[in-house]
């Protein structure tokens, strides 16, 4: 898909269109150029986007791919007139559901107007604040209210997973590094012992860990393959002895890791 452009056109922020589009584009190995065009909510704005799409088609010699989330039928029709392949999330999914349910959808742009008043929003903000305060073992206070405590060697994916769980699912996720001193003692950090049942481990292939650490501290003992192998082996042995469930982050996305953790610790969050 070289020299190909993908547009994400929305009458809101464009986040839904982009998320929808990227989930489909992820099935293909090529990486096209991305263009987001949010707040396209009038015919004049739509015609401007059409000109941009047509100019792109002429320049590249291939029609662009256009993902749209547009409520207004006139605006949708204008975008559809462009020289492009239109993939319409609302037309593809919402309209068939209207027919199936026998009711019209609300057709409200984005539906974010009252999100700040919702309990879900409040829970997510609290979870984000908790995860930031308990990142990388910064604090051992209030671990009793954590939903999960991620443990593992440094750079195994604990921080991004913690923040994803907080932002997407309202999970209070702390994370705590397992370091050489812990391996020398052969025991979990003392702060984690009372909360062992809340711990979930992340491990990683030593070769991949070396690559990540080398970017941070090149040519150091910390990043050496031998040290990475020793730390990973010691961490996995410790988690096994302590009965802590764990998974490898080597070939998994943050979304896959988070979903696996949710399935194990909070399956209720998969139903809402």
Curated annotation (Swiss-Prot):
Its EC number is 2.7.11.33, 2.7.4.28. GO terms for molecular function: ADP binding; ATP binding; phosphotransferase activity, phosphate group as acceptor; protein serine/threonine kinase activity. ADP binds at residues 152-159. Keywords: Kinase, Nucleotide-binding, Serine/threonine-protein kinase, Transferase. It catalyses: [pyruvate, water dikinase] + ADP = [pyruvate, water dikinase]-phosphate + AMP + H(+); [pyruvate, water dikinase]-phosphate + phosphate + H(+) = [pyruvate, water dikinase] + diphosphate. Disulfide bonds: none annotated. PANTHER family: PYRUVATE, PHOSPHATE DIKINASE REGULATORY PROTEIN 1, CHLOROPLASTIC (PTHR31756:SF3). Belongs to the pyruvate, phosphate/water dikinase regulatory protein family. PSRP subfamily. Bifunctional serine/threonine kinase and phosphorylase involved in the regulation of the phosphoenolpyruvate synthase (PEPS) by catalyzing its phosphorylation/dephosphorylation. NCBIfam families: PRK05339.1. This is Putative phosphoenolpyruvate synthase regulatory protein. It comes from Methylibium petroleiphilum (strain ATCC BAA-1232 / LMG 22953 / PM1). The lineage of its organism: Bacteria, Pseudomonadati, Pseudomonadota, Betaproteobacteria, Burkholderiales.
